[in-house]
């Protein structure tokens, strides 16, 4: 009862933090005088600390949890988990894209705007990287196998295209405004760009391989398995401490974002049709499609399940980062919704990297909306191209704030539009980014229940459940109880097993 009260109290403070952050943000806004970046950084400082503490724990948590989970399974069970996860994630992403295309084609929000596109394009601050869909696929495959594992913990690579007129390089800001036909007149040279940021996909692939190998070699792998079990327990305990600070961090993150907006009302009015379309799509996917999958495939009560994920969803809303929310997602799935830790610690890190339903839906809507604003009606083939490219772009999107605006450039290239037209939607991206991140985290969490149900037989045959006291399952709570609990998967009381 004391544990339940403490968890409810933390959730209450998290909700209160959201409300206080909104109120504080609007009360500190001064329409006549904008805040300087320095002053905004001061206001955002407590929130930045919260996000950085979460990100600090991502690396040890991801590697230790995946390795420990898969080391407890036989190779057949691990393979089944991976195959089912990939199929499920791909299908839900495709459906999200399809839903977005249907809504934007019916509502036609691009016809609502009176925006002067030429004025916007002329004042855009461009992104100095142009890449095609093929380049992105190649980047994705290469990211799975980093040549230097240590470098992958803090640096990632991608391919950017540079254009030359003879020996003279075309400035990236000019290349971005050109159509594919115009770019074809110049020499195209792909170049590898190294950027700061963890290569999570590469670390996940390595951890999966290492975990399977540790399980295969048996007794010889026990020292490694015990090491990662201890590392996981420590990571989870640290996460539990960081989460206590979450209401404070969330308050100042939201307040700083609101204070930094130039004119929320004017920007929202200009993009009203687009915002309505995206939000409607996200609501349908989050409250109809995903809960339906939860009922039909997982045989769980979606309302109760979402209630157990409330704290993670609020954190996703505040941080707009599925990667930063990952530690809390694992905690909520395991402690509140009683999902098998072997599933959560494999499925959630993978989902935070490649399962971006909300991002995929947003990219499909945004690309067609921009095309409508530009006066370009897409053909059926171009719509199909948008769906495929949006799916690939969402898979390649990093779980960081506003990663979707970067992958949007790839979708615009695919349909032949100037890439700097993303400025049309940029003013409201901060808000939609938080909503689509919340949908991403929501979809990942439901995926754990679905995959647990679909792989139930293999999980029962593939090895014992994780020892929650050794591995930190209970360590997420500051006053965890060592007593095991018997739970059931779905509504099947005959298939109960120990956690």
UniProtKB/Swiss-Prot annotation:
Subcellular localization, per the record? Cell membrane
* Membrane-spanning ranges: 8-28, 50-70, 87-107, 194-217, 227-254, 276-297, 343-369, 430-451
Q: Which GO terms describe its molecular function?
A: glutamate:sodium symporter activity; L-glutamate transmembrane transporter activity; metal ion binding; neutral L-amino acid transmembrane transporter activity
Binding site residues for Na(+) 1: 351, 355, 440, 444
Specify the superkingdom.
Eukaryota
**Briefly, what is this protein's role?**
Sodium-dependent, high-affinity amino acid transporter that mediates the uptake of L-glutamate and also L-aspartate and D-aspartate. Functions as a symporter that transports one amino acid molecule together with two or three Na(+) ions and one proton, in parallel with the counter-transport of one K(+) ion. Mediates Cl(-) flux that is not coupled to amino acid transport; this avoids the accumulation of negative charges due to aspartate and Na(+) symport.
What does the entry's free-text domain comment contain? Answer: Contains eight transmembrane regions plus two helical hairpins that dip into the membrane. These helical hairpin structures play an important role in the transport process. The first enters the membrane from the cytoplasmic side, the second one from the extracellular side. During the transport cycle, the regions involved in amino acid transport, and especially the helical hairpins, move vertically by about 15-18 Angstroms, alternating between exposure to the aqueous phase and reinsertion in the lipid bilayer. In contrast, the regions involved in trimerization do not move.
Q: What is this protein called?
A: Putative sodium-dependent excitatory amino acid transporter glt-4
State the organism named in the record.
Caenorhabditis elegans
